A protein has these predicted regions:
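Non-catalytic, surface beta->alpha helical segment in thiol-disulfide oxidoreductase systems
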Residues: 61-84
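Short cysteine clusters
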Residues: 15-18, 209-211
Length: 242
């Protein structure tokens, strides 16, 4: 038998997963014989020879371990479930927009915490969340139909919403056209909050939220409600200051 430090492993690859497999093996102390599959013909021949459907494939001491996920399991590491839900995308957005608001306040006023910091945090969040929805407008609109009360009655609202959220966020950041941006934010935030509350807390439905776009695995819940409540609070605040 060979010690881990000297054990030989072969990685057959033609894509980024091969680089990840090689990095993981080296981090575990393995010497890697990195064998590239340079052409489609070579890749197809390799798959046929070993009866596999994907590359890369890892072999340790002439024993086939499998693909990258199989390699992680071999080392006892967690393998991400592609269907698992997570609040991480929304939390990342809020963290980045909060830090950006602090930075903007520091630049504009010489202090990170000012009256504008919270305003900018909310308006920046609206802009980023709206932008994420706009990346896949059809996907968002379809997912939105699962729970939004207005979209279920008037389907085109699913395509209008991302533009309304982004536009209101931009105008609120600039404190421009408050007579337009605040009512828009109040309207879409109010409908959104009612929709999420009904779906989650009354109907007890387990749905995915379209808050970061149509392909997200974010569960519909408290953070989804928070997005809408922030828009409502921002709209009321700006209307009160007019």
């Amino acid at each position: 038998t060979q010690s881990r430090s000297s054990a030989a492993s072969d990685v057959y690859k033609r894509q980024a997963w091969g680089l990840r497999a090689r990095h993981l093996l080296k981090s575990k102390g393995y010497q890697v014989d990195d064998r590239w599959l340079e052409t489609r013909e070579a890749t197809d021949a390799f798959k046929a020879e070993h009866g596999v459907k994907t590359t890369p494939q890892t072999f340790i001491d002439e024993r086939r371990i499998g693909g990258f996920d199989d390699l992680r399991r071999f080392f006892g590491l967690r393998v991400r479930d592609p269907e698992a839900t997570s609040y991480t995308p929304v939390l990342v957005v809020f963290a980045v927009t909060a830090l950006t608001a602090l930075a903007a306040s520091h630049t504009a006023y010489g202090a990170p915490l000012t009256g504008r910091t919270i305003e900018w945090f909310i308006s920046f969040s609206m802009c980023v969340l709206g932008m994420l929805k706009l990346q896949n407008l059809d996907g968002f609109a379809t997912m939105f139909l699962n729970y939004d009360l207005l979209a279920r009655r008037w389907v085109p609202y699913g395509w209008v919403y991302p533009f309304a959220e982004t536009g209101a966020g931009v105008l609120m950041t600039a404190h421009a056209l408050t007579w337009l941006s605040a009512p828009v934010a109040l309207f879409i935030g109010g409908i959104g909050a009612a929709s999420v509350f009904k779906a989650v807390y009354i109907d007890r439905r387990e749905l995915k939220c379209a808050c970061v776009g149509g392909d997200s695995k974010v569960p519909l819940g408290f953070l989804s409600l928070t997005e809408n409540l922030m828009m409502i609070a921002m709209a009321v605040w700006m209307l009160a200051r007019m």
